[in-house]
Each structure stands twice: as structure tokens, then as C-alpha cells.
């Protein structure tokens, strides 16, 4: 079985191709939209994805050394994500499905991140940290679905860091030589400033932390503010994670999503793993950010259990939660 996967939920337009036997991933091509200034405007995202889609599709097929006729199914991320961006991927997937008579496989973007984590880390029964620009979720698989033990109550951890560095003119670009701008800034800081620390049960709140940090700009060294906001945010995440580990007694902790690439977070998680005697399994950088390979791979798993959707019912779902998705391939 060969599945072509399309990812377009946010800043990245990606196309991946997955096979139902090793090495599983045959292609993983993408292009990310980076605004010249400010945040991402939905209209700019749509324009970028529409212009990049043809080139990325062709590159993926060339990388896998196959033609579109060799593909069995078309998988597409229908949510969660930004509406105009989602529509580009959905429109391309529907067009390919109709023109080449291929069944369409609906994929939840979050499930894509989680399943590529299972594949690349070889985790068996982990507690999962899903950390990206739009999501901060602590979850694990139980009775047919991924159940949420904790999540952000407002903005996501990755989004909080992006907004801070943008507001203090450290970004865009947000990632420089593999490092987030807040990590680069934090390396020159050492003073831990007093900022809000909000953990409620296993849920976290980052909006007050962001506001308080921005109010310190001009009053404290920017490097110390960067250091403080990052350290406090990561400590909040670790406290919530420790509570979930205590509740679930899991012996593996799998980290997926773009924030998983943070070197400083990795060090904290490794220390947590030693303290709790838990194996830390972090998705490789190539598959940490948004990518088409994870959609193709999750689509392949879904297709193996007959999960398809009619083209005329393939609506985008910008607020599609991970705990709303049935996972028949793990039962």
C-alpha cells in the first residue's frame, strides 16, 4: 500500500509518501511560510500554500521515484488548524482523489504527530507530550482513543514563545540554525525573574506568563526575561507531566511536535526521566515540525482499517480535537 499525505494546517505545506512496510517513509517534502514581519495572516498562508503545492507534490513523487498512478490512497489533514490554510490542502486532496480515482483518507493533524512519534521512537505504551505552536497536550491511548490528561487552558506553549519573541523584535525568523529565538536569547540570561506560574491540576495557563513577561521589557535585561519565561513555562509543563506520570504509572514518555526540538527542554526531560525511572523518547527533528510524512503514515494506518471519507463530506475541521478521533488500528 502506498499513501500520499498532504499537510497544510498552519505555516507548512508538506507532502509525504508512506508505504506499509519498512522503511515506511519514502518522501517528506515541505515548504514553510515565514512572514517578513509580524504574525501569520491567513490570506498570506493561503497564497503561499497554493503557490507551493504543485512544486512540493512533484518533489515528493520524484523523491519516492513513483508516479501518482502508483498511489493507492490520498490522505489529508482536515484539522485542527487555520481555515484558509486547511482549505488549500483539502482542495488539492479532493482534486487528486477525483482525477485519479483514489479514495480519500481523513487525518487529524494531532494524530499524525503522535503516530509518527510511535514509528520513529519505537515507543510501545507511552505517556505523550504533544507540544507544537498550536497545541500543548498530555495524552495517552486508552480504549480506542487518545485521552487527554492535561492541556493548556489558553494559548499553547509554542505559540506563547513565538508571540513573545515577535513582540520584542527577536523574530521572525523564529528558528535560527535549529534553535528557537527564545533559546538563543536565553543563553545570555541567568537571573530568574518573578513571573506567574499557573498549573491547575494537570492543566497549564501561559497567557498570564506572556503578559507579565512583556510588561518587564525595558525594566529588566531582555536576556533575563527570555531566560525566565522559558524556564518557568518548561517547569510548569514538567510539573503537569509528573502528575500524569504518577497517575498513569507509564514507563515511557514520548515527546512529539515542533517544540520537541528544543535542546533546553530535552535536558529537563532527560532529568525528569532519571528521577522517575522513565524512558524519554523524542521524535527526531525531521519529523518534529509539521510534515506530510506524518499525515501519509497516519493515513496508511487508517486506510488499513477502512477509514475513508467521501469527497463531498471532506469538510475541514479547524477545531478537531485529538480525543474526538477513533483509533481502530490500536485496538
UniProtKB/Swiss-Prot annotation:
Compartments, record wording: Cytoplasm
Record GO cellular component, one term: cytoplasm
Cofactor note text: Binds 1 Fe(2+) ion per subunit.
Enzyme class: transferase
Superkingdom of origin: Archaea
UniProt GO BP: tRNA threonylcarbamoyladenosine modification
Annotated keywords: Acyltransferase, Cytoplasm, Iron, Metal-binding, Transferase, tRNA processing
Protein name, UniProt field: tRNA N6-adenosine threonylcarbamoyltransferase
Species, as recorded: Saccharolobus islandicus (strain Y.N.15.51 / Yellowstone #2)
Gene: kae1
Amino acid at each position: 500500500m502506498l499513501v500520499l499525505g498532504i499537510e497544510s494546517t498552519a505555516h507548512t505545506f508538506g507532502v509525504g509518501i508512506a508505504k506499509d512496510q519498512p522503511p515506511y517513509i519514502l518522501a517528506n517534502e515541505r515548504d514553510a511560510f515565514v512572514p517578513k514581519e509580524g504574525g501569520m495572516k491567513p490570506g498570506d498562508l493561503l497564497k503561499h500554500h497554493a503557490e507551493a503545492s504543485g512544486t512540493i507534490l512533484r518533489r515528493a513523487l520524484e523523491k519516492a521515484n513513483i508516479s501518482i498512478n502508483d498511489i493507492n490512497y490520498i490522505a489529508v489533514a482536515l484539522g485542527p488548524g487555520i481555515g484558509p490554510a486547511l482549505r488549500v490542502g483539502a482542495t488539492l486532496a479532493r482534486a487528486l482523489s477525483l482525477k485519479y480515482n483514489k479514495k480519500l483518507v481523513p487525518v487529524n493533524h494531532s494524530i499524525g504527530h503522535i503516530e509518527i512519534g510511535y514509528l520513529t521512537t519505537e515507543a510501545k505504551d507511552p505517556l505523550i507530550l504533544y507540544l507544537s505552536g498550536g497545541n500543548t497536550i498530555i495524552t495517552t491511548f486508552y480504549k480506542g482513543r487518545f485521552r487527554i490528561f492535561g492541556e493548556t487552558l489558553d494559548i499553547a506553549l509554542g505559540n506563547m514563545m513565538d508571540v513573545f519573541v515577535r513582540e520584542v523584535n527577536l523574530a521572525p525568523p523564529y528558528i535560527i540554525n535549529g534553535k528557537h529565538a527564545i533559546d538563543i536569547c536565553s543563553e545570555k540570561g541567568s537571573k530568574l525573574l518573578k513571573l506567574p506560574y499557573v498549573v491547575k491540576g494537570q492543566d497549564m495557563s501561559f497567557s498570564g506568563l506572556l503578559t507579565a513577561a512583556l510588561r518587564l521589557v525595558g525594566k529588566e535585561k531582555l536576556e533575563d526575561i527570555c531566560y525566565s519565561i522559558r524556564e518557568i513555562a518548561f517547569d510548569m509543563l514538567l510539573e503537569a507531566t509528573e502528575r500524569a506520570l504518577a497517575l498513569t504509572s507509564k514507563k515511557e514518555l514520548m515527546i512529539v511536535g515542533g517544540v520537541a526540538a528544543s535542546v533546553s527542554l530535552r535536558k529537563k526531560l532527560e532529568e525528569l526521566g532519571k528521577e522517575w525511572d522513565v524512558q524519554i523518547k523524542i521524535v527526531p527533528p525531521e519529523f518534529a515540525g509539521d510534515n506530510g510524512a506524518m499525515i501519509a503514515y497516519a493515513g496508511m494506518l487508517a486506510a488499513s482499517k477502512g477509514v475513508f471519507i467521501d469527497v463531498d463530506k471532506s469538510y475541514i475541521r479547524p477545531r478537531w480535537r485529538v480525543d474526538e478521533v477513533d483509533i481502530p488500528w490500536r485496538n
